[in-house]
Design a protein with these regions (language model features):
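A polyanion-binding, active-site-adjacent surface
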Residues: 1-187
Length: 187
């Protein structure tokens, strides 16, 4: 099947008045880079949106293409990077180059109360943002379900819904849904 790829930087989407922000690493090569919408059209999206739907944070359990009718409820999804990093391993320069876009999206969401960071790099990107822009001090260790209160926000660490993490059972629906429900209780 021949498809035309979006092939441009991918920005966040969702409820601009949302109280929950989900932060991922980067657009998937054959997901968001193909479709133009973050967490759309790949295995990570399949797992994530099944969990978001069961948690009451989306109107449907699938995210396949831009015109599939998907709507997030009180939630906005963004990325640490806007383009696919080679071998899914971003360099420090790539993260720094995208930090301005990350900052703009975080600042755009005025009602944010909870951030769920999907994976260590997304988590570290959030912490770095608050250290640089809000004077945050200290060290913060990533782990699934860790919770930190930072500048009036709560930040959760969550294992990324990658096929590797799902197939090895590092993350499963029960764990992810439980974490999203914990996030909802804080809003």
């Amino acid at each position: 099947m021949n498809q035309i790829y979006w092939g441009k930087p991918v920005s966040g989407f969702g409820d601009l008045n949302g109280e929950i922000i989900i932060v991922g690493l980067a657009p998937a090569a054959h997901g968001a880079t193909r479709t133009g919408r973050v967490f759309t059209g790949d295995k990570s999206a399949d797992f994530l949106f099944k969990c978001l739907f069961k948690s009451g944070l989306s109107n449907q359990s699938n995210s396949e293409h831009l015109k599939d009718g998907l709507k997030l409820k009180n939630t906005f999804i963004t990325l640490a990077l806007r383009c696919v990093p080679p071998n899914d391993k971003p360099t420090k320069d790539e993260l720094n180059n995208c930090s301005i876009f990350f900052k703009e999206e975080l600042n755009m969401i005025k009602n944010k109360k909870v951030i769920v960071a999907l994976g260590k790099i997304a988590f570290d990107t959030c912490i770095k943002f608050y250290k640089k822009n809000n004077g945050l001090k200290g060290s913060f260790k990533f782990g699934h379900g860790v919770k930190y209160h930072i500048n009036g926000l709560t930040i959760f660490g969550c294992y990324h819904p990658s096929p590797r993490n799902v197939n090895t059972k590092r993350i499963n629906e029960t764990k992810m849904i439980y974490l999203f429900k914990r996030a909802k209780k804080l809003i």
